[in-house]
């Protein structure tokens, strides 16, 4: 998107309610738009708004392999509440096994380099897969 397009779009959507802005993007990019949900309160609010407009919109989250049990319960409750299925993307377990075998399970505490490695394997690679085919997220 070019700078001029952003300026034009800002003018077009200026003063609109959040639901109106979401409706615009959900319609314009149908099938190529997704909510990358952290499952935090803000994303739960966006999930409610999006499902009120188009419950077929893709909503996904990442499971790094280090989530709390309550997170899985929240995913289930959210799915039931809105009649949706949040897609869950996981890291490649071979890569996780190799990383943990070589550097330990809490390697991200040991150095910035290991933190980057861990984030790359557990977050960035699954995120790349989740974004395939998407134009807007």
Predicted region positions:
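ATP-dependent adenylation/nucleotidyltransferase module used to activate substrates
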Residues: 1-137
């Amino acid at each position: 998107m070019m700078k001029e397009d952003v300026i034009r779009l800002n003018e077009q959507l200026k003063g609109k309610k959040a639901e109106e802005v979401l409706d615009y993007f959900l319609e314009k990019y149908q099938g190529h738009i997704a909510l990358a949900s952290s499952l935090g309160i803000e994303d739960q609010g966006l999930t409610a708004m999006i499902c009120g407009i188009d419950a077929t919109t893709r909503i996904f989250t990442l499971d790094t392999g280090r989530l709390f049990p309550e997170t899985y319960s929240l995913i289930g409750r959210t799915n039931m509440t809105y009649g949706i299925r949040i897609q869950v993307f996981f890291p490649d377990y071979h890569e996780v096994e190799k990383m943990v075998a070589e550097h330990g399970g809490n390697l991200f505490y040991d150095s910035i380099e290991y933190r980057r490695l861990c984030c790359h394997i557990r977050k960035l690679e699954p995120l790349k897969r989740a974004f395939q085919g998407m134009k807007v997220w």
